Design a protein with these regions (language model features):
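N-terminal alpha-helical targeting/anchoring segments
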Residues: 1-134, 149, 153
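TRNA-recognition modules of translation machinery and tRNA-sensing kinases, especially anticodon-binding
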Residues: 27, 130-428
């Protein structure tokens, strides 16, 4: 959410930003919110004047009574009563205007970083860099579900019976591999100085509205019927929510956190063959990294976060690349974002396995996350997030890049201690 003062003084910058995000339908909202803000400030000015006048007249009532000037006293009382009535009306009006302004401000997108390429959707994202050499083996690589079934590691039919489409049973060595990857991700981030958390898996609507746009919420989140609770789509939501209405001393920054959680998403719509199996599902587990920092440090942390993802995947012998997300592909709260994509030797292309974002002070402004400074007073923090790893999708990249011709799976050195010392998962 933008600062209303910034919008008031820079309406053309805000409008240009909206155009760059290809959201022209929101352009009228800028002028509308400016008019509402003007009306709100005029009402506040009138209310301040009335309070000053009321206080001045109220002081005279006692004087009039002491002087026996009852008529003057009654006249003053009537003026005070009239002012009180108008003040009550103004207060109600201000509350209504504040709500209208907030609703509009919540849908006006954040100002993107100047380095973000202008583009309409993800097809116009720009490759930044490749890490590791993508390879295609001499043998044919099966679909990831077929690989898992050959290892007796997945049961989709049973999951459809118990839960419907978009769910899975992992078992045996594949289930163990799934857990091993998450355990390794946890320790990988702890070794880089991040504090490990297991957060609540449900959050209230106040937090939901603070961390994401309404449209994102509608498309992603499951609501608990009869409760003011939503199942989280990522632990970023509950971890950023942890700081709601908090003032953090500058000396305690940055806050660098890594969190594990199951995640739940609607994933509405039909999907092609490449998004079936365990690629696009309603329930999965994820290790996340979150940073709360001073504004001047946020871009440095942004670069550190995506580099963490690259280093993690390369430690597991998976080639990756980074993509700069274009303006039209950025969610409304994001200032800048890059996707981390893993190489698929079966498809001979990269696919998304994580996303790193800086949101400026958008989430902090919505949730009241401020920094305490002796020199600057209290000011809003910056927040960032990035995926460490999200199996089972990451399993697709892992299995394809570590598949042997006989169907067995190589276990990289980094994971073996989490797999009981195994170096290979054998075909059953």
């Amino acid at each position: 959410m933008l600062d209303i003062k910034f919008l008031r003084t820079n309406p053309e910058i805000v409008k240009t930003n909206i155009k760059n995000k290809f959201q022209d339908e929101k352009l009228p909202l800028v002028d509308e919110v400016i008019e509402l803000d003007k009306e709100f400030r005029e009402s506040k000015t009138r209310a301040e004047y009335l309070r000053s006048q009321r206080n001045s007249i109220s002081k005279k009532i006692g004087f009039y009574m002491a002087q026996g000037q009852k008529d003057e006293a009654e006249k003053a009382k009537a003026e005070v009563a009239s002012m009180a009535s108008e003040l009550e009306e103004l207060s109600a009006k201000e509350t209504e205007l504040e709500e209208k302004i907030r609703k509009i401000m919540l849908v006006i997108p954040n100002i993107i970083d100047p380095s973000v390429p202008i583009g309409k959707d993800d097809s116009e994202n720009v490759e930044i860099e490749k890490f590791g050499d993508p390879f295609v083996p001499s043998f044919e690589i099966p679909y990831h579900v077929d690989i898992m079934e050959k290892l007796d590691g997945i049961d989709l039919d049973a999951a459809r019976k118990t839960s419907g489409n978009g769910f899975y049973y992992l078992k045996g060595d594949i289930a163990r591999l799934h857990s091993a990857i998450l355990s390794y991700a946890r320790d990988f981030m702890i070794d880089r100085g991040f504090t490990y958390y297991i957060p609540p898996f449900m959050i209230r609507s106040a937090v939901v509205n603070g961390v994401m746009s309404f449209s994102e919420m509608e498309n992603m989140m499951y609501k608990i019927e009869g409760e003011d609770l939503y199942l989280i789509g990522t632990s970023e939501h509950s971890m950023i929510g942890k700081f709601i209405d908090t003032i953090i001393d500058e000396a305690d920054l940055p806050q660098t956190l890594t969190s594990y959680s199951p995640c739940f998403r609607k994933e509405v719509g039909a999907h092609g063959i490449e998004e079936r199996g365990v690629y696009r599902i309603h329930q999965f587990e994820k290790q996340e990294m979150i940073v709360v920092c001073k504004p001047e440090d946020s871009m440095d942390w942004y670069n550190k976060l995506w580099q963490n993802s690259v280093d993690f995947f390369r430690s597991l012998d998976i080639p990756v690349r980074t993509l700069e997300c274009c303006s039209g592909d950025l969610a409304d709260l994001k200032v800048k974002s890059c996707d981390v994509e893993a190489w698929s030797p079966r498809q001979k292309k990269y696919f998304e396995v994580g996303s790193c974002s800086t949101l400026g002070d958008a989430q902090a402004r919505r949730l009241g996350i401020r920094i305490k400074s002796k020199e600057k007073g209290n000011y809003f923090a910056h927040t960032l997030n990035n995926t460490v790893v999200a199996p089972p999708r990451m399993l697709i990249a892992f299995l394809e890049n570590n598949l042997n011709e006989d169907g067995s799976i190589r276990i990289p050195e980094a994971l073996r201690m989490y797999m009981g010392g195994k170096s290979v998962i054998e075909v059953k």
